Amino acid sequence: MGSEMCIRDRLEVDNYEKDESLRCMILTGSEKAFAAGADIKQMQPKTYMDVYKEDFITRNWERVASCRKPIIAAVSGYALGGGCELAMMCDFMVASESAKFGQPEINLGVSPGAGGTQRLTRFIGKSKSMDMCLTGRMMEAEEAESIGLVSRILSNDDFVDGVVDIAKEVADKSLVATMMTKEMVNRAYETTLAEGVRFERRLFHSMFATKDKTEGMAAFVEKRKPEFKDE
């Protein structure tokens, strides 16, 4: 995962967010690896001043986390180091049975540097995060699901079709409601419970001004599928 790939990811997210016809993005890699981490050969000669001036890694990757539309991480094979951090920037992770997660940067004499220590701790707690970050061990998909890092596991054979079905289910909803709900959930990690509930209530009330709310509730009463217009 070199700098060119990071820039490409940022541009893809920019285009996705601007395109009104797109309602859900799947971020994935190959069957063997979601992403096996940063390009170590590219990193090796860098100095402190190099990485500081470049805002190395996070400058482009954080665009995934800041996207207002939903992004699903579809993890098959290895998601190590920066790959695991990139997956955690997505809204939720779906893993294949063969998926493996890890933050092995400690083996290189450094720490995670793209949000790994912060997001991992929020997702799975201090003890498990310390375990992964200090030992560099890999975590199997089953363990990742059991502690909440992964939302669900799909079979290797049906993985691609299964993830696409999930994305279609997300995309079928009102994009306005989806974006607001995403904003609410993300706020839970950054504020107190009382403030979070107030924030949720304000956005919930604002949805009553949308045409999609009118359509969604009318469709429910009339026992038909809603036709959302994202308005």
What do the predicted segments below correspond to?
Residues 1-7:
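Short, small-residue-biased leader/transition segments that mark boundaries at the very start
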Residues 9, 13, 61-64, 167:
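Hydrophobic core positions within the conserved protein kinase catalytic domain
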Residues 225-231:
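Short C-terminal tail/terminal secondary-structure segment
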Residues 65-178, 206-210, 215-218, 224:
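Crotonase-fold acyl-CoA enzyme core
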Residues 18, 29-63, 79, 109, ...:
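Glycine- (often His-adjacent) and acidic-residue-rich active-site loop
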Residues 10-23:
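A short, N-terminal amphipathic alpha-helix
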